[in-house]
Amino acid sequence: MTHPIFMVGARGCGKTTVGHQLAQALGYDFVDTDLFMQQTTNMTVADVVAQEGWHGFRQRESLALQQVTSNRCIIATGGGMVLAEANRRFMHDKGTVIYLHADAELLAQRLEENPQDNQRPTLTGRPIAEEMADVLAAREALYRGVAHHVIDASQAPEAIVASVLKALRLSAA
């Protein structure tokens, strides 16, 4: 298997952490679409949203997805990457999509424990636990619909990587 592996899920589910470890385990490259965008625009996600709005950000996000996709690469996508049907189709057709599933309470806890200065701005302006519940309610079907494999992301990163590797081996058999 050499095609790209796309990591999808809400903020805080572990896409970047797990993606790095998975890339090491497989000998693949690793790219985070948000970090790629920040490096190519010299702006944080919050800056892009402030200057161009969410629509402009989503357009940049879709372009970044296409630019970074290559064989033997793990791609950690932004939590909203699945909102565009074209992105879902692209990821599903070009590689294997892994959905790292975690409940809203765990996501909020992780985001509160590890706040980032350049973290995406709030979508709703409400407390993070409420926002994550709303985000999952709106996106859960999209994450599951695009995914080739759904992985429980409530475990430690090493256990999640082991679960992903097992799922990939089973699908390759």
UniProtKB/Swiss-Prot annotation:
Cofactor(s) needed, names only, are: Mg(2+)
Binding annotation for Mg(2+): T16, D32
Q: Which UniProt keywords apply?
A: Amino-acid biosynthesis, Aromatic amino acid biosynthesis, ATP-binding, Cytoplasm, Kinase, Magnesium, Metal-binding, Nucleotide-binding, Transferase
The primary location reported for this protein is cytoplasm
- Location(s), subcellular: Cytoplasm
- Supply one GO BP term: chorismate biosynthetic process
Q: How does the record comment on the protein's domains?
A: The LID domain closes over the active site upon ATP binding.
Describe the family membership recorded for this protein in Swiss-Prot or TrEMBL: Belongs to the shikimate kinase family. AroL subfamily.
Indicate what this protein is called per its UniProt record: Shikimate kinase 2
Source species of the chain: Pectobacterium carotovorum subsp. carotovorum (strain PC1)
- The gene name reads aroL
